[in-house]
Structure formats: C-alpha cells, structure tokens
Design a protein with these regions (language model features):
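Bacterial Sec-dependent N-terminal signal peptides
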Residues: 1-20
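Extracellular/oxidizing-compartment recognition motifs
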Residues: 20-339, 343, 369-372, 389-393, ...
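Active-site acid/base region of carbohydrate-active enzymes
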Residues: 61, 126, 144, 296-325, ...
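Helix-terminus loop motifs that line ligand-binding clefts
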Residues: 73-78, 82, 252-259, 368-466, ...
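Repeat-solenoid scaffold signature
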Residues: 109-128, 567-610
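Non-catalytic C-terminal accessory modules of carbohydrate-active enzymes
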Residues: 124, 128, 150-172, 187, ...
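Carbohydrate-binding/catalytic loop surfaces
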Residues: 343-354, 390-406, 448-477, 524-546, ...
Length: 744
C-alpha cells in the first residue's frame, strides 16, 4: 500500500486523538469560548476531477467557512457525544468553494457541551484532495491543524454555565474585533475521534412574529405563535445605543430560571444584527429590552421537518389536535443526534423519556441516524461493571432502571420499526452487561433500590403522574421489575438473532423467575391489584401476563376498569412510564373507546388542557397555516395554582402518539418481518370517529390507510406485504398495490 492509500485508510477509519493537533485560542483568562481559527491552503489546480475535503473534529460546536463562504446548511455541528471519551468527525466536500491559488479555511468554534466536560473550544481539521482513478482513490494531504494556524477571539460568548436551568444564552459584543495570533494546541489523548453517524441539524422553518406588543416597562414582547426550538435572528435600528437583552419564554408567564437570555452590545459602525450561533433556545415569546425598533424572525432547528413523516387525521378535531401536538413536540425535541427531555432547561438525553416515546418517534419519522448516534453515547457511558447513568451523554440526573434500560429497548425497537439489526449486533455485549448488573442488584428476582451516586440520583418508576396517583412504594419495585422482564424477553429474541442460543435460554429462564417473583411479591388477591393498583401497575401485569390464570387476569382487568371509570373519572392516570404502558395495553386489548374518552377530557388532568390559548380557552382546531400551535408539557400540573411551573415543551407524555396509528388507523409492524416488510392493518372502531386517514413512512415506501363508511382502503408499498383485518372472517394477506375491503 502506498502512502496515499495509507492516508485514505486513516481518513476513513476512527482516529484516536493521541498525538493529533486540536487547536484553539488562548486568552488572558484561559481559552476563548467562541474563537475563530484559520489557515491558508494553496491549490495548484482545481477542476481536474479532484475533490477537496475538510474533515473537522471539534470539542464543541463548529462552523466551516472557505473563502468567506459558509459551507453546507447544517447547524450546531457536530452531534452530541461523550466528550470526555469521544469527539465526532464531520466531512465537508468544499470543492465548490475553492479556487486556484490561495484559499482561506476558517473554523468558527463554540465550546458548547465542552463546558460540562472541561474541554476548550478546540478543533482538529484535515484538508485533503481526492481523485478517483481506475486503480483506486488518490489522496493528497494539503493541510492539518497545528500551531501554524492563526486564532482570534470572536464577538460571541456564553452567559450561562451550561448546567440544567443555567444554560443562559449568547452575548454578542460588537466592540470585539479580531485579534489574530498563533493558535494554541490542546492535547486530548484520551479522546477517540470517530465519524458522525447523525446527518445533522437543519433550519426546517422560518417564522415571523404574529404580534409585537409594547409592555409597560417599554420592552417589546414578540409572539411567534408556537414554540420553536432554534435561533432568533434580529436586526436592530441603527439608532440603538443601549445594551439589548432578549429573554426567551416557552409560555407567557415563564420566569427565571425557566427563561434564557441573550445579550447584544452595539458599537458604532456595526451592522446592528444578532443571530444565535452556538446556542439554541425553546421559545414562543421573546421579551426584548433596550431596542426601540427591530425586525425579527425565528429559525426552527431540528433533525426532522415537522411537516414531513407520518400523517394522521380523523373526524374528531380533539383527537387530531392531540396527535398534531405530540408530533410537533417530538420534532422540537429531536436534534443533534439524540432526543431530549426538553430543549432548553435540561437538554438531557434521558433514557426514560426515550423509552416512553421511541415507538411514537420511530412511527412518525425515519430517525435511524439519530438512534445510531445516541446509542454510541450510551455505549461510551457504560461502565465495565454494567452500570449506566440515566441519560446519555452521561450527566448526573434522576431516574431508575427504566431510564438505563434504553440500551436494550432502543436496538430492539429500531429493528422492529426499521428492520435494522445493526444496533443489536454492535451493542449486544453492552446490553448483556447491563442486565448482569441489574441481576446483581436484585433479591429474589426483584431489583432493589440503590443509593445515589455521582452518576445518578433516585430510583424511580413512573414519574409526574397526576395528583392522586400513588407512584411510590411497591409501585416502584413492581413497575421496574415488569420493565426488567420485558427487557429479558427482548434480549432472548436478540440473543437468538445473533446466534447466542445459550444466552437466549438463560434470558428466558431468568424472565420466568422475575415474572413469578412479581406475582408472588406484589399481587393482592383481596383487591385484585398489583402493588399500588395504579393504571401502570395493573396494565403492566396484564401485558406481561404475570398472573397465574385467566380468572385472575379477568379480575385484575375488571378492577382496572372500575378504577379508571370511578376513582380517576375517565381521566389520564399515568406519567412518563405509565402513558406508553397504558397505550400499549389499550392497543392490544382494542380499548379505543376507552382511550378516546380519556383523551377527549377537557379538564385536568388531560392533553386538551395543553391546547388552551393565552386566554385559557380550549383551542383544539389542530394545525393551521402556521402549523400546530401547542406542545406537550413536562407535568399535567403546569399552570395549576400553587404548583411548581415546568417546561411547556417536553417529552413526558408523548408515548400516546403511537395509538393513533396502531389503533385508529390499525397499522402495526410484524416483528417476524421487521421494518414493515410485512405489517398488519386492523383499524379499531371508535365511537365518534367516522373516518380515519393516515400514512406511515417505511423503508419500502409509504403505507396509506383510509377508513370511511365501513370501507377500508390500503396502499401497500413495493417490497412489502400486509395482512388486512387479522383474526376476522375477512382476513386476507396482500402484496404491493391498493386494496379495498369492507370492515363489516
């Protein structure tokens, strides 16, 4: 192999950063937070069939400019990673930006998550050209980051600590001018550099203010009509002389620490414009002080376009509003290679929130690249003894085994929903190690609470259930043990897939022991309840069939329904963990009338409470020309007198979203032929729903279903097959094409 081939091999494979040159900018008090680094690259010729590439691995965010032009449309690059262990490399084809002779390559950096890990804003960059020939690719190294580069501070700086509820914002000081100096090198021998799996964030929408009101304190309040995750871009009047503050609110009454603030410091002769660069906010409102006149727009950032993906509509405007709210919320929460709890206050990749809504998210969009990136962070967070944090990248947070078990559920669900087994093969040993850790924490088959550590706090099961639902005590151990049993079932399947038959037998036997222990420890025959008898407790036991016989199952179900109708008044009675479990039970047991009744409740606790307008009136007309107007909340209690206020764009309750597709539209995957290579279409009748129309993207194309006047029309994409109305007299299996059958 010649040196060019060797270089190509090195560029194509993950690099260990030992001996590599990360460069940044030193200032008097340490490292600049948002520096610029640059180098001039000479090209003897262009347009000879060669392509020119820049590969960038930054400890924090970066933007790439070549000859003054920004390269690409991706923002907040790279994705998140476990920065004490891994930096992500992004490759840019800069051929359209270069010219013969001198070319300036400039990287603008932002420390970002490096603030948490004690990493400076530093970057490793490689510039090379590549020519494809019949004999293979020829690669020529043109430049690599080192101390010959130049660096300068920039006008941007951070105002917060990058800790939960303390993220702050950005300060742009127009008085700061470039002061170029030799770049400082930073050794990161403990960091692995590997290619980014995630495709990158894009600006998916641009919004103008729907209103701009002058408040009594002379500040301006901008209302963009809906919550967005992203940036503010604003042009101030040239007469602006004061320091301008921009405070971001996800609802009108939000106050610190539930708000974040950017700062603009003008200078004579500056362009009087501000736009976020290495920070993002979640906001509907912006309160601006210090500016008399301005023009503003909100730039919505995400991994998915909220107008793309799966679609659903039915004859009930209330159900449509909830579906649209859940879908739009998830588009606000999915970015940078993970799905967060909330995009502004914590920004954590919680496994519990992920488990709660993965089936919904993967039903709505193709987010395989997000899960590949996110699972890499879970791998990096895993300790040799199998212990995991509750979020990845790792951060000390609250949660429990349901949060950690994302490492098992995400690969299995990605396989079922996309037919992609790569995560199973890549992380099988990690999943097995975590389950061994859980077994060591168990007594008589029941996992026991552990002490708080520097990695995680608390030992939770359900979280933020409505007032009056007892989610403590036995319920924590019961629901957690049910989840472990579910993970063991998934692991048994994955072990057989990967040829680990002996492991599969062990997982199956262990699951039987856990299920028997659940019934033995938590069933109360006198009340026909498990643990505390919550909706989560009862539904999980029924889903896993932990009871001894069908009579007991019928008694447990009857008690569950009595409590839902009586104690809970046909209202939702579950939290983060309970919502997806209850949803799955309703789908399996064809309880669409029950779910619809609960979803239609206009008062606390319920989803429609989240669709109230600024005057407190319900507004469930769904999306308009502006898109969905509402997002789901962190707590059912948001806005209630005397209750702690929380995030108004959150991932606690989005697990219900799959119900619209699997129950009302009836589109269900077949784990035996995953990725919707074969699927079922079995719409469930629901009182008050006269028609349903839905589409679902799959690796084979879109599935389309329409149900109207007792007639079911189904489009099956090429390469797929579907079983229509399984278990009924009209059951039939069909191939690609459009099919119509009568429901009755």
């Amino acid at each position: 192999m010649n040196w060019r081939g060797l270089l190509l091999l090195l560029l194509a494979l993950p690099l260990v950063a030992r001996g590599q040159q990360f460069v940044g900018c030193r200032v008097d008090d340490g490292w600049a937070e948002t520096p610029m680094v640059r180098q001039v690259v000479a090209l003897e010729a262009v347009g000879d069939g060669r392509t020119v590439w820049v590969e960038v691995a930054s400890l924090g965010y970066h933007e790439l400019y070549v000859n003054g032009m920004r390269v690409g449309d991706r923002v907040l690059q790279p994705a998140v990673s476990q920065l004490d262990k891994r930096a992500l490399r992004v490759a840019y084809d800069v051929t359209p930006y270069v010219r013969q002779g001198r070319n300036e390559v400039l990287l603008w950096l932002g420390q970002g998550w490096g603030r948490v890990y004690g990493r400076p804003a530093a970057v490793e960059a490689v510039v090379y050209s590549r020519l494809e020939t019949p004999a293979g690719a020829e690669v020529e190294l043109l430049c690599r980051s080192d101390s010959t580069w130049q660096a300068s501070p920039s006008p941007y700086a951070y105002t917060g600590s990058w800790q939960p509820l303390q993220f702050g914002g950005e300060r742009y000081d127009a008085r700061v001018k470039p002061q170029w100096r030799p770049a400082a090198t930073y050794e990161a021998e403990d960091v692995v550099v590997s290619p980014q799996e995630f495709a990158g964030n894009r600006i998916v929408d641009t919004l103008l203010p729907q209103s701009m009101d002058r408040l009594p304190d002379s500040s301006l309040l901008l209302d963009f009509g809906r919550v967005v995750t992203g940036w503010l871009s604003v042009a101030f009047s040239p007469t602006t002389r004061e320091v301008v503050t921009m405070e971001y609110l996800d609802h009108r009454e939000a106050v610190p620490p539930h708000t974040e603030t950017d700062i603009f410091i003008p200078d004579s002769g500056c362009n009087y414009q501000f736009q976020n660069r290495f920070h993002a906010h979640a906001f509907r409102y912006v309160r601006i002080k210090g500016a008399c006149r301005l023009q503003a727009k909100a730039l919505q950032i995400g991994a998915v376009d909220p107008t793309s993906g799966a679609t659903f509509a039915c004859s009930d405007a209330r159900l449509n509003a909830i579906h649209d709210m859940v879908k739009y919320t998830l588009s606000c929460l999915t970015f940078s290679g993970y799905m967060v709890d909330c995009p502004h206050l914590e920004r954590m990749g919680y496994g519990g929130d992920g488990n709660s809504s993965t089936n919904t998210l993967q039903t709505l969009w193709d987010v395989r690249d997000t899960y590949r990136q996110w699972m890499q962070a879970w791998h990096d967070a895993l300790r040799p003894d199998g212990d995991l944090p509750y979020a990845a990248p790792a951060f000390r947070t609250g949660g429990g085994p349901y949060w950690q078990g994302f490492i098992v559920k995400a690969p299995w669900r990605s396989y079922v929903n996309y037919g992609d087994s790569s995560l199973i093969f890549l992380y099988y040993d990690d999943m097995k190690r975590w389950l061994e850790y859980i077994e060591r924490q168990s007594v008589d088959g029941i996992v026991q609470p552990w002490k708080d550590t520097e990695r995680h706090a608390w030992f939770l099961a359900d979280w933020l259930a409505p007032e009056g639902v007892d989610i403590g005590g036995e319920s924590v151990l019961h629901a957690t043990s049910c989840f472990v049993a579910e993970c063991l079932l998934d692991m048994e399947r994955m072990a057989r897939m990967t040829g680990h038959d002996a492991d599969a037998a062990l997982f199956a036997a262990r699951r039987q022991r856990v299920v028997a222990a659940i019934h033995r420890h938590f069933y109360h025959p006198e009340s026909h309840t498990y643990a505390n008898g919550t909706v989560l407790d009862q539904c999980y036991a029924l889903l896993l069939n932990v009871m001894d016989d069908s009579v007991t199952a019928a008694q447990v179900e009857a008690q569950l329904l009595r409590d839902i109708h009586g104690k809970y008044r046909d209202h939702i009675a579950a939290g983060l963990m309970g919502v997806p479990v209850f949803t799955e039970w309703c789908i399996r047991e064809r309880r669409s009338d029950l779910m619809a009744t609960i979803l239609r409740q206009p008062d606390y606790p319920g989803y429609l409470c989240m669709t109230k307008d600024e005057f407190g009136k319900l507004n469930f007309e769904g999306a308009d020309a502006m898109g969905p107007k509402f997002t789901t909340w962190e707590s059912w209690d948001c806005g209630r007198p005397g209750k702690e206020d929380r995030s108004r764009v959150h991932n606690c309750y989005n697990g219900v979203g799959v119900w619209f597709y699997q129950a009302l539209a009836g589109i269900r995957p077949d784990p035996a032929q995953p990725g919707y290579r074969h699927f079922f279409v079995d719409p469930q009748p629901c009182e008050g729903v006269n028609w349903v129309r839905a589409s679902k993207p799959t690796p084979y194309g879109d599935i389309r279903v329409e149900l109207r006047d007792g007639s079911l029309k189904v489009f099956v994409p090429e390469g797929s097959s579907a079983t229509l109305l399984p278990g009924s007299e009209r059951e039939r299996t069909v191939g690609p094409g459009e099919w119509t059958v009568r429901m009755e």
